[in-house]
């Protein structure tokens, strides 16, 4: 469809000629975003074209269900003004382009209070409870999901990567190790709601207030999953001291809200194991984007993500067989 056809469905009262339309660069998804600026008054909104929404029931579509859930619980998200399931389009509030990544890069002194606020928002999100038979509470980081992410990495980072030369024995051994790591992460009694992609590009900070986007894949899992996404971020490396402070803040707030009763040492152990899984999953995505889709903008994040692995391996012996094998097979990417 042409853009004007989407606009006719969502804004039938306004002529496309009255709007200035500019493309917004998205992340690793098939959704497309455009900023619409009303020429008469400079007011802006965002057009999102989501192929997955086309023909779906809005009452059960995860993007709408999760957005309403977060908004009802006081989590700041872009408002949805209109939607049209026939074309798969949304008209959203424009919360600007100031991502957490950009903001911290431009204002490094904000690394303290701003990240404290983001951790507080995360714990607020992880405190939300709901019906276990309904999305997003019916979904979880179960064995099937975690192993799917490991297998995606094995396929795109190793099997289909001409710069890696794994043997069949290497791949079988690695998959066995991934199965064992997955088992360590299946502590379902500790599961809470997770955003699932809680990194610095999915948090906008207009006027310094966190606004959460790209939340449609929310599901249940260990609270460390989202904390890892934020604190062991492929796109933005935080100082180790600040990471330690934020880990402590996250753990303490989980305890204060009755969401966890583990020691801080146990929290840190699961954090490392979860971080290993999460970073390996991210590597699979980056190789897929670069080698399959030809999107080389993700290439720089391969080495920065691999750089996290030695720390996990050193601290957690359970990760050593898989971690050392991955680093050896991808040694050409290790800086």
PLM feature spans:
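An alpha-helical support segment within catalytic cores of ATP-dependent transferases
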Residues: 3, 7-13, 130-139, 144-145, ...
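Short secondary-structure junctions
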Residues: 10-19, 73-75
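ATP-binding glycine-rich phosphate-binding loop
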Residues: 19-34
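Active-site acidic catalytic loop and adjacent metal/ATP-binding pocket
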Residues: 31-37, 47, 125-126, 179-225, ...
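Secondary-structure capping and boundary motifs in well-ordered enzyme cores
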Residues: 145, 195, 219-220, 268-276
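ATP/Mg2+ or Mg2+-diphosphate-binding catalytic cores
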Residues: 282-335
């Amino acid at each position: 469809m042409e853009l004007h056809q989407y606009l006719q469905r969502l804004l039938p009262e306004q002529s496309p000629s009255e709007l200035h339309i500019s493309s917004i660069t998205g992340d690793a998804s098939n959704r497309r975003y455009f900023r619409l600026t009303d020429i008469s008054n400079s007011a802006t909104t965002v057009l999102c074209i989501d192929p997955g929404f086309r023909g779906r029931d809005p009452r059960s579509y995860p993007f709408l269900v999760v957005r309403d859930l977060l908004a009802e619980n006081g989590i700041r998200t872009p408002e949805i003004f209109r939607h049209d399931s026939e074309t798969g389009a949304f008209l959203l509030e424009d919360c600007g382009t100031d991502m957490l990544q950009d903001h911290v890069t431009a204002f490094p002194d904000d690394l303290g209070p701003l990240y404290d606020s983001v951790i507080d928002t995360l714990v607020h999100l992880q405190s939300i409870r709901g019906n276990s038979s309904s999305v997003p509470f019916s979904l979880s980081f179960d064995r099937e999901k975690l192993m799917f992410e490991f297998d995606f990495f094995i396929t795109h980072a190793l099997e289909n990567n001409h710069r890696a030369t794994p043997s069949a024995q290497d791949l079988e051994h690695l998959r066995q190790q991934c199965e064992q790591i997955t088992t360590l992460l299946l502590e379902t009694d500790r599961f809470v709601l997770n955003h699932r992609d809680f990194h610095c590009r999915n948090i906008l900070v207009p006027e310094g207030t966190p606004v959460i986007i790209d939340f449609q894949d929310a599901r249940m899992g260990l609270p460390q999953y989202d904390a890892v996404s934020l604190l062991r971020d492929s796109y933005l490396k935080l100082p180790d001291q600040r990471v330690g402070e934020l880990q402590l803040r996250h753990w303490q707030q989980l305890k204060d809200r009755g969401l966890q009763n583990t020691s801080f040492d146990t929290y840190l152990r699961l954090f490392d194991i979860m971080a290993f899984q999460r970073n390996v999953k991210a590597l699979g995505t980056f190789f897929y984007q670069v080698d399959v889709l030809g999107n080389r903008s993700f290439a720089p994040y391969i080495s920065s993500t691999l750089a996290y692995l030695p720390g996990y391996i050193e601290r957690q012996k359970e990760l050593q067989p898989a971690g050392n094998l991955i680093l050896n097979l991808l040694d050409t990417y290790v800086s």
